[in-house]
Amino acid sequence: MVVQNNFLFIAFIFVTFMMLDAWQSESYDYKSLDKNHIIEKKNIENKNINKEVFSRENYITVITDLFILKINTYGGDIEEASLRTYLSNTKNNLPLKILDRSKNFIYKLKSGFITKNDHDINNLIHIPNFISDKKLYILEDNSDYLQVPLFYNGENGLKYVKNFIFKKNSFSLKINYSIKNTNKDKMEMMFFGQLEQSIKDQEINNGYNFNFHTYRGAAYSSDNNKYKKYDFSEISNDKNLNVITSNGWIAMLQQYFIVAWIPKIENKYKFYTKNIPKDEKVSIGFQSELFSIDQEEEKNIESTLWIGPKLQDKMYEVDANLGLTVDYGWLWFIAQPLLQLLKFIYKYINNWGISIIIITFMVRGIMFPLTKAQYTSMAKMRILQPKIIEIKNKFSNDKKRQSKEMMSLYKKQKVNPLGGCMPLIIQMPIFLALYYMLSGSVELRHAHFVLWINDLSSKDPYYILPIIMGITMFLIQKISPSSISDPVQKKIVSFMPLIFTIFFLWFPSGLVLYYIISNLVTIIQQYIIYKDLKKVGILI
């Protein structure tokens, strides 16, 4: 009775939600990126570091507990960055590469100084060629910090040091400039920082999951917007960003990972985007106001860079608004507490799958009074069905009288006609918040559960969990009394377990696990509720 009607209601709500989410997510579709660009937590020993990282003459290599980086001395920018504690996939021990400059894909940083005559940052004539004391920098086990200084002496009398500062156990790093003017004339310049990424024939999120809630694109935070997405499609169509702000950051995002640049803004900065059609790239960057450096004057410019997973608590420590990039949609106020609860359980269980099972029991237990009210109301409505049909037939030509008589019947029998669906409507935000939370949390990426489930964030490779979920839905349907008389509706309802099974084949394993446990709880709760209803004579 209850479940048959609920199947249709849930299907409608769920499909509507998915369509709305697809429209709101602003995700931009790109094809086929090597999955090395989709990024979990396992230590990779130094012996697994590819020796190729030492081979190129104009690159220096930086190795910390979390990073393997390549910095090009020509320009002094990070052009490749791999995360040592996150794997490219579950089949190898290779660290995930975030920043890259391969033949088919470019995702890199660029920063430096320009004059008022430099109109195009992407076609600079004068690019500094830095020198470094070493080709290899390693953050030792007994050190908390590592500094990588690069030096440049320009022909125009400009000298500066570009210093990368890494901190142990941190995905954020400092990029600090110390500039000195040894020229006899005052110099005027602007500081800029930029993120660039290829957009053609790439697949960072596509095909990884059947997951509409995935966003790949640019974003920024400014005086007027704490967090604003800026889609790659807008940039590639030359709908460029031009924002003046006194604080904030720029970033490029994918499902679980982010590269964000936070300049220390003393006055005003311009945030901008740029389409680079020649290289099939887009960029987002920041640029300072024009400033001057007198003869023998020295100026320091600081910025912070985050390269890594969307770890909300850690990102909030770097910038108050950076944690907003962990996007749990419009139900964030429910999803975030649920994630904190999941993390709390994981601390003691050390298995994300079991943690999901426990939180499912907890959530369904808390909602049990609502579930019982829903089943009770629907059972009462079923008892009233003969009288409702009688009223409908008696006053078929007088809808106003029909409605009045039915409301009188409900009042007399103390039945709320909305009592069956209202508890379900109240529960839906919690279920949808769990969807957001389970599909958007990097903690579940490559998280092992049991046996063949090595990644709770991706689909079940053998589709066993979706099939089990379909079986549980079939069992719920079979043990539930039915009041559906319409043969068409009855046929549709009978196919719902199969439809949902197919629908869930590509869902993240963690989410399917949640629905399996939730369905098992439903079976248990149905037995308890129906037993109580039979005792009081409501259910026959």
Curated annotation (Swiss-Prot):
Membrane topology term: Multi-pass membrane protein
Domain of life: Bacteria
Residue ranges that the Swiss-Prot or TrEMBL entry lists as coiled coil: none
Transmembrane domains' residue ranges: 1-21, 351-371, 418-438, 464-484, 497-517
Stored InterPro entries: Membr_insert_YidC, Membr_insert_YidC_N, YidC/ALB3/OXA1/COX18, YidC/Oxa/ALB_C, YidC_ALB_C, YidC_periplasmic_sf
HAMAP family: YidC_type1
Protein name: Membrane protein insertase YidC
